[in-house]
């Protein structure tokens, strides 16, 4: 495992425990922080990788790699289709399409904890100049708003987003007034599904009865207005683009804004258990899964492995 300039918080629990771990970083304090290192290299990441390329040997094309390229392309197409879908109730994906559309080349994303975290990972079209921050290992709900304040204070000339679910937003919404008081033009986006969605997902996975997950419907646009910033409610597809255009206009004028998007409480597709493979599941179970998650065009990895003759 080559761990380059990363602070990925789940390295200890998600990587194989016996994997050879090589870490490159220019900060000595983080070497070995997330995982025991076999080789720790204190150096510039870019220069190190360039040197690795010079010293390394070209690898031969492999069927395994080709199968995974096809698999990733299929997954990306699924996400793109969901962001463009307008024939269902309002979901979170079209909002991310708008966020991607208006994002500046060096935008900063402060991502809260919950379904919004995994949705951001899947749907934000980030480039190498667009950092995003969250509370990974501790999963501290409510981190999005203070993170956006810190980002805007640190980088006043860069576009900053706060992306949060309604559960997290309700915990810290009083600090919208801090953005107003200090003239911090942040684009706040609240995904309101009237539930602690990620906890609901976990309870479903563990076969628990629903407990403690329902949230009262909150008018976050009115909350924002009450604290001195413009609040916009979106509950229809055709309201999405004008809302984000208005957000750009306001923040360019030096004013923060909040967009409250009223979405369905439909679960994001659980990639840890994709029920697609006919060799593992019966057809009805597969059909039910595809219908629930609009995954008619998703193909199991096993199909691509067969296509490329991977044994």
Each model region followed by its residue ranges:
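Active-site diphosphate/adenylate-binding microenvironment
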Residues: 72-146, 151
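Conserved thiamine diphosphate
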Residues: 48, 58, 203-245
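Short beta-alpha connecting loops at secondary-structure transitions
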Residues: 31-39, 130-134, 171, 200-212, ...
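Glycine-rich beta-alpha junction loops
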Residues: 113-117, 193-195, 262-267
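Glycine-rich, acidic loop regions that bind phosphate or pyrophosphate groups
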Residues: 1-67, 203, 244-247
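A short, gly/pro- and small-residue-rich
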Residues: 11-30, 129-130, 271-285
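Glycine/aspartate-rich loop-and-adjacent alpha/beta segment that forms the canonical ThDP
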Residues: 12, 246-311
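Thiamine diphosphate
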Residues: 1, 6-9, 118-196
């Amino acid at each position: 495992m080559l761990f380059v300039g990363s602070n990925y918080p789940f390295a200890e629990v998600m990587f194989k425990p016996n994997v050879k771990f090589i870490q490159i970083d220019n900060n000595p304090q983080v070497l070995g922080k997330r995982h025991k290192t076999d080789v720790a290299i204190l150096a510039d990441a870019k220069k190190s990788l360039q040197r690795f390329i010079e010293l390394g040997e070209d690898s031969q094309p492999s069927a395994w790699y080709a199968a995974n390229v096809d698999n990733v392309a299929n997954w990306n197409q699924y996400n793109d289709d969901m962001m463009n879908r307008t024939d269902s109730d309002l979901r979170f994906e079209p909002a991310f399409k708008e966020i991607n559309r208006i994002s500046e080349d060096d935008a900063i994303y402060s991502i809260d904890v919950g379904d919004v975290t995994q949705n951001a990972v899947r749907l934000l079209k980030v480039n190498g100049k667009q950092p995003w921050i969250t509370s990974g290992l501790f999963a501290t709900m409510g981190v999005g708003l203070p993170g956006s304040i810190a980002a805007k204070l640190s980088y006043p000339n860069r576009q900053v987003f706060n992306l949060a679910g309604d559960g997290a937003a309700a915990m810290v919404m009083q600090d919208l007034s801090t953005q107003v008081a200090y003239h911090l033009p942040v684009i706040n986006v609240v995904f309101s599904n009237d539930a602690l969605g990620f906890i609901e997902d976990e309870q479903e996975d563990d076969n628990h009865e629903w407990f403690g997950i329902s949230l009262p419907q909150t008018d976050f646009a009115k909350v924002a207005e009450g604290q001195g910033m413009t609040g916009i409610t979106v509950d229809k597809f055709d309201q999405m683009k004008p809302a984000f255009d208005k957000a750009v206009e306001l923040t360019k004028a030096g004013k923060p804004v909040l967009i409250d998007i009223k979405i369905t409480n439909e679960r994001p597709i659980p990639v840890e258990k994709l029920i697609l493979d006919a060799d593992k599941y019966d057809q009805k179970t597969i059909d039910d899964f595809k219908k629930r998650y609009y995954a008619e065009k998703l193909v199991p990895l096993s199909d691509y492995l067969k296509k490329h003759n991977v044994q």
